[in-house]
Amino acid sequence: ILDRIKFQIYPKFLMSASFPTHLEVEAASKCQMKCPMCWTTYMKENVKGLMKMDLYKKIVDEAAANNVFSIKLSWRGEPMLNPNLIEMIKYAKKKKIKHVAFLTNAELLTKKKSHELLESGCDYISISADGVDEIYDKIRFPAKFEETVARIKYLKQIR
């Protein structure tokens, strides 16, 4: 409970703990989509990549040693492009990180991946959508709104 209080209350009073209570770790700094409003669409290729598991483990080990409450495995890129994403989630949970989450465009959310994510211990997944139907299809190219909705429904169904 104390970790949750620090995580939610400290920032409101412009206070900080001696170590962050939440980390955002970019599992992937690249994306398979070309959304017009997104930074990754315009980033140079030499700064796009995937976080290596050995570096991730060092970050999580230090975070766990300092009682970090939560880790989000995304920032600008699509974390599901990282083939180690499931292992990353499991490792953080094994190290007693209480909340592990990520943001995705859901384009790589296959039925198999949905099951793996549920079994990994991931606490929540946030899915980006910018409108519906044709608007979504235009902004989230090459994604298709109905296909994305079907993937989300499947994940909800098996949850």
Give each language-model segment a name.
Residues I127-A129:
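Conserved phosphate-donor/acceptor-positioning beta-strand/loop module used by diverse small-molecule
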Residues I152-Q157:
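Alpha-helix-loop-beta-strand connector modules within alpha/beta enzyme cores
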Residues I1-Y124, K138, P142, E146-A150:
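Conserved alpha-helical substructure of the radical SAM core
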Residues G131-E134:
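Flexible loop/hinge segments that line or gate small-molecule binding clefts
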